[in-house]
Amino acid sequence: MTEQKYVVALDQGTTSSRAVVLDHDANIVSVSQREFTQIYPQAGWVEHDPMEIYATQSSTLVEALGKAGIRSDEVAAIGITNQRETTVVWNKETGKPVYNAIVWQCRRTAAICEELKERGLESYIRDNTGLVLDPYFSGTKIKWILDNVEGAREQAEAGQLLFGTVDTWLVWKMTQGRVHVTDYTNASRTMLFNINTLQWDEKILAEFNIPLSMMPEVKKSSEVYGQTNIGGKGGTRIPIAGIAGDQQAALYGQMCVQAGQAKNTYGTGCFLLMNTGQEKVTSHNGLLTTLACGPRGEPAYALEGAVFMGGASIQWLRDELKLISDARDSEYFATKVDTSNGVYVVPAFTGLGAPYWDAYARGTIVGLTRGVNSNHIIRATLESIAYQTRDVLDAMQADSGIKLSALRVDGGAVANNFLMQFQADVLDTEVHRPKVTEVTALGAAYLAGLAVGFWDGLEELQGKAEIDRSFKPHHDEEKRQRRYKGWKRAVKCAQAWAVLHNEEE
């Protein structure tokens, strides 16, 4: 029998599908990545083609192994991590989606959310799912598909349709339709899963008019769900043994498995998660209570705050404003000036996430004077990422009663030393950047590897989490508070835009 030397993480993100191959020492041996189409049918709507998601993801798996000359029988397990909340509904007989995947960023169900609030469901949903009633989560997206796609409601009632977040869709496709599962972390993002009983909530399903028969079976984040065949007939069968939503996978990859440990992922959006262990902490500050992975992939509780526009605001500087030609240039231009010259950018392009939850706020630049140049705007845009992170972290510390000793960071923007230092200064907290910043993939790989005995346990993995650099805060308190007050004022301006609009109508 061939020695199994590798674990593969499939990282299905918002803009690209990736495959990351790790060896036993948790070193990255090979990476393959493919972007796929972003579909914007109308303002505020975002979709993906589920078939393209599967095609790009399966081809990166083959590519990553091929690049490194790794045979499929050398792979011990596959772990999956995915963009969360994004919703796929498909016909189980034909295997075809009835509609495009509705992406987490999509705001089309805002009116459905308003209607559910009017029906008095808000507090029940909050208490039992840990989430706020917002278009972000899967529940209203499924309802929209059933209500708006011709024939979907009838097929659903007849038991022909299945729902899945992206992990569920990939596993179903990879096992030729044999396995319809998700894990606790992804289930907890649907707004349909009761985090007290750890079951699908039949009251919410009934209120949304979604048949229980559509829902996947919910399992731990680290166990063998099924096997996939690589290399066609007579190929190798490899266990799919780990699933976690991208943010929970990153939390696990950062080894935040104990209560009070927290991380921030700077991706398209920013996502802060704090593990609260077996204690369900209810937020009074606009955060979500959600499920994360305990030490062995069993469900644990966490607090989460989502910032919708993190790296996406740097892309906006590049693609729409054309102030930079490469996202990496943002640090260079931001450091050409000493301050943002009184400018604040509030990148509320799709509303504001935690702790504000204002779907109607819009992007705003305030404090413009004649002396402001493009470098100030670039700097203020980077600073907005750090300010939004502080908004969330302040709320987390208030809810949990835990003062954070250090923040672990990951994601594309952590390569930006200016942003990391400014983040430490704004928070007055050390920021730790790990050597391996692919922590989302690491988390999925760890969960899969542990399930099949590729690694013995957490102690072995914790020895692999090395820090590349610690950023220590070095600002005086008066300056910190003054700047942050200015940010809070700027946010009020972004929120006032919609309020004033409503008053005029």
UniProtKB/Swiss-Prot annotation:
For the ligand (glycerol), the binding residues are R84, E85, Y136, D246, Q247
The record, for CDD domains, names: ASKHA_NBD_FGGY_GK (cd07769)
Annotated ATP binding lies at T14, T15, S16, T268, G311, Q315, G412
- Regulation of catalytic or functional activity: Inhibited by fructose 1,6-bisphosphate (FBP).
Q: Which residues bind sn-glycerol 3-phosphate?
A: T14, R84, E85, Y136, D246
InterPro entries recorded: ATPase_NBD (IPR043129), Carb_kinase_FGGY (IPR000577), Carb_kinase_FGGY_CS (IPR018483), FGGY_C (IPR018485), FGGY_N (IPR018484), Glycerol_kin (IPR005999)
Query: What's the protein called, per UniProt?
Result: Glycerol kinase
| Native source species | Vibrio cholerae serotype O1 (strain ATCC 39315 / El Tor Inaba N16961)
List the gene name: glpK
